[in-house]
Structure formats: C-alpha cells, structure tokens
Amino acid sequence: MAVKENNQGACKRKSAEDLQHFVRNDFKKRSALGDLTNIPCATRCNHYSKCNLSPLKSAKVENPQIYESYDSKINEYLHQLERKRKNSIAVDYMERIQSDVTPAMRGKLVDWLLEVADEYSLQSRTLFLAVNCVDRFLSSSTIKRQKLQLLGITCILISSKYEEITPPSVKELCDITDNSFSKDEVVKMEATVLNALRFEMGNPTAVTFLSSITAVALGDFKEFGLQLETLGCYIAELSLLEYGCLEFLPSLVAASAVFLARFIIRPARCPWNAELEECSGYEPRELKSCVLLLYGCFIRYGRGIIKPSALIPNHYFL
C-alpha cells in the first residue's frame, strides 16, 4: 500500500515537473526585438514568471482570523478599482488611436517582454503591470512602430521600479535591445510614459486576482495543486499576448484562466462551483467568451503542454 501511494505521489510530482519544464524549455540568450514590419503574431508564450500566487499564505495559516477579516474588504476594493479604471485602456485603440502599430506587432512586443522578464527573473506582477502600462500608453498616445520596443523596455523599467527590490538598470535594458536606444532616450521616454499615465501605477491586473481565486480552486483540486497553479499562471500570461483580451476586466481574465486550467487538467469534472462563483463574483456564463478566447490561445501557443479536449461542453457554462 505504501509503495502504491509513493508511486502515485511520484507520478503527480513528475507531471507537475513536466508542466513547469515545458513553459521554461525554450529559454535562450535574449536578443533585440528586430523589425516589426509585417511581423506575424508571436508563435507562443515561452515564459514562466515567478507568480508567487500566495505571498501571505504562511502568515494566513498562522493567523487565519486576522487575514480572513481583511480578505473580503481587499477583494471588494480591488474590484471597485478595476471598474473605476476600466476606461484607462481603450479596447479599440489599434483602430482609433494607432495608425502605424498593429495587434500583431503588439503581440510580438509582448512576447519579447515575456522573455525579458524571464531573463531578469522578474515577478509576474511586474510583467503584467508593464504590459498594462504599454496598453494604457497606446490608448492615449500615438507611436511609430520604430519606437514600440523603446516603449516596451521603458514600461519594464517603470514597473520594475514599482514592484522589484532590485530592478534592472537602464544600461541593462539598453543592452538587451542591442543598444538600439540610448540611456538618454529611455530616461526621456520614462518621463513621457509616466506623464501620459498620470503617474497612476496601482492598476489591478489579472495576476492581482489570480491568488485568491486559485486558493479557492485548490479546495477540491488538492491532488493537482501544483499543476493548477502552474497552468493557471501560464494561461493568464497567454492572455497578455491576445489583444482581444483587453475587452475583459482583469478579474474576469483571472477567473477564466482558473476555469480553463481546471478543465484542461480534469475535463470530465465541471470546472466551476459555488465557492469559485462567490470568490470571483462571476457565474460561468459570464466567463464563456473569455474562456473560449483563452482556449484558442492555449491551443495555438501551448502545444505539447497537456493534450486538450476538443471542445468545452456547453453545459459547463450554464
């Protein structure tokens, strides 16, 4: 009996390790982004950042009463904040604002930023905030495609200063672009971006909500805990590549990522339940459009990670 349990445990660990290996296995020396003219959209997301889904997990275990009293208030505040700042990103800025940048170019830039974040071992929240800054800037200011990479590394610099203990230096970020831009250009662009964003850096992103939703999702998924956390993070990061995901609130993207991760791991089990609905604030029917969009991204970019089922049964969204 003990041998059987050990074998089962080893299989689960191996499965989780295989999943983590997949999202890391294309690590290579980073290079400059290159020409964005007529570039196809990124082939796949190959980054796995340090999600750190539950930084207060150990503290909550030791003092559950203290933290539980704040959880609902914090969650309510974050939902209010994301609704308040919803209009800071125009979901159609490519059509209305930009004339020299396309969704495919944005996808190429974000894919490169994923690699930069991997190179410097940046936190997942740093990456998500950087992409948020890119989209907010592009929603209000026109830019030439030749300056798109400059915008990207500038937003990485800004978000790193906001989130990281030791952010990469301006020189390091210039080097990673093969010195396509000078330090003075980056510093000048930093001021331009911050002024365009009105110095508002506290915008919630999908990763902001991923922790609390994943914690609830693990309740009846403990045997697949590591897989669920890893795959949920991966799918959330895939959403960054998809311009179409801008129409959804960050909390809805996070909930959809967890929904999809649970379905991919256990397709025969309904991926949503009353606890997840209460925690996220979303019924499954509200997640359908985003889940299907993310599932398409996963099929395109995540080949080999886990063999997905052909279709998500419609009754899972009822």
Give the ranges of each region predicted by the language model.
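Acidic, serine/threonine-rich low-complexity regulatory regions at protein termini
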Residues: 1-153, 157-318
